[in-house]
């Protein structure tokens, strides 16, 4: 059983380059007096980023599934009212029925799944029809880059992002052609994502 060795290796990593980049970008945006939404998939990432930002003196809050509805509303309103600068959440919790586009125009995607609906819904939290012409809206996609067995650079995050873009193109084509296309299974998604890794 290598569980303890693996745990030690993971703990020895410290802060990843992806997380450093996310924190640095967030700090830059906050210093420009911009509010930021950071999208994650994993609760541990949400909590870790919040703790790191707070240690940097940046006011941040997180909304995750265990947060009661009335508390979600209060936290969202506090974000809109400027009581904190960064909202960290996930699309399972906050991707629908929340409008932040009047106060926030920067979203950082620290983690993302290959569920296109989650991506599109989360993007819509800071961008809506009816925004002022020329309104700035910016999405940032964090990516960890590794070397595969051939020492070629490889990014799982980039593979997931490219898969999402493919799905979006298929969706838009289906809308334009008024014709549904077959959808990919999770197994096909994984096969496409991992094909360049090994």
Q: Over which residues does each language-model region extend?
A:
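A conserved SF2-helicase RecA2
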Residues: 114-198
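Conserved Helicase C-terminal RecA-like lobe
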Residues: 1-87, 92-99, 180-198
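Hydrophobic residues at beta-strand termini and immediately following loops
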Residues: 63, 110, 142
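SF2 helicase motor core recognition
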Residues: 46-50, 73, 87-111, 115-136
């Amino acid at each position: 059983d290598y569980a303890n060795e693996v745990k030690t290796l993971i703990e020895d990593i410290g802060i990843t380059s992806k997380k450093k980049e996310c924190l640095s970008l967030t700090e830059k945006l906050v210093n420009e007096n911009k509010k930021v939404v950071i999208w994650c998939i994993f609760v541990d990432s949400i909590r870790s980023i919040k703790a790191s930002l707070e240690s940097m003196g940046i006011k941040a809050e997180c909304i995750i599934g265990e947060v009661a509805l009335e508390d979600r509303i209060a936290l969202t309103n506090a974000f809109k009212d400027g009581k904190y600068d960064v909202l960290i959440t996930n699309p399972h919790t906050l991707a629908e029925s929340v409008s932040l586009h009047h106060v926030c125009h920067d979203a950082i995607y620290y983690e993302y799944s290959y569920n296109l609906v989650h991506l599109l819904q989360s993007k819509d939290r800071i961008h809506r029809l009816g925004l002022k012409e020329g309104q700035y809206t910016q999405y940032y996609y964090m990516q960890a880059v590794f070397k595969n067995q051939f020492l070629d650079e490889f990014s799982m995050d980039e593979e997931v992002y490219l898969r999402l873009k493919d799905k979006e193109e298929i969706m838009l084509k289906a809308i334009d052609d008024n014709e549904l296309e077959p959808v990919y299974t999770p197994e096909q998604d994984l096969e496409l994502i991992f094909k360049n890794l090994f």
